[in-house]
């Protein structure tokens, strides 16, 4: 049941990754062993992409929690997976401070501090893929990209990805950093049956061969369990192919573009098993067209961030 692979830059990774953010939800603090087991099960099944971030934590004073958890899971793994094939990605650029004060800081010094902290939490000498989390509206976007390039030039990171970008921001990043050969290798944006506004970004990534990692591919934790009732066609097609609505969503996303690599979250090993199963499902052209024709709610998981900050 090993999932097929797709490319992120010069690397091949499983076509379905594991979004690790839910493992650091406050409700998971008393289920640490289960969190570790969830990552271990993903590795057992051939998942070679783990996505984390410095701000994924149960509280503001535990920043780095998710990175440390992922590092522990990798360090304690004794299963059959070849860990030399594993890609652990993290992010920087969003701040989370005293009393849950959220902000953005992509100044060069702040990005360096964040990357250095992530190196320590992950227990590595270099970050294989570092993703710029969100545009800092106080700074020119090109300047933020220069900061990322400096991290790469200085050997803190190997590859650069973007997150939560619009088409204009992506094009600026490409101008500064270059394309997937030696510059921008991935884009991580929201994309799901619920939210599809970034189709133009996906199209650009498909054109250039830049990996597109849709976050919250099932519409977020609050909607994932009932995605089949909110978007009935995913349940209908799922019945036709012997899959759950959630598995059908992942199969549909994979069929949208050869650069698509969903990163669904999980807090139980069984959920990872379902995601990996979805990577092997095949949709007919007619089924794919029905799913694509379904109407999105078009509401972001984080509506306060829309419309996006103006490009400066």
Predicted regions and their residues:
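Active-site mouth loops of central-metabolism enzymes
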Residues: 21-33, 98-109, 133-139
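Short, acidic/polar
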Residues: 30-43, 106-122, 170-171
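Beta/alpha (TIM)-barrel catalytic core signal, keyed to glycine-rich beta->alpha loops juxtaposed to Asp/Glu
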Residues: 135-312
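N-terminal binding-site loop/beta-alpha segment at the start of enzyme catalytic domains
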Residues: 1-83
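Short, well-ordered coil/turn segments that N-cap beta-strands
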Residues: 11-16, 46-48, 80-86, 124-128, ...
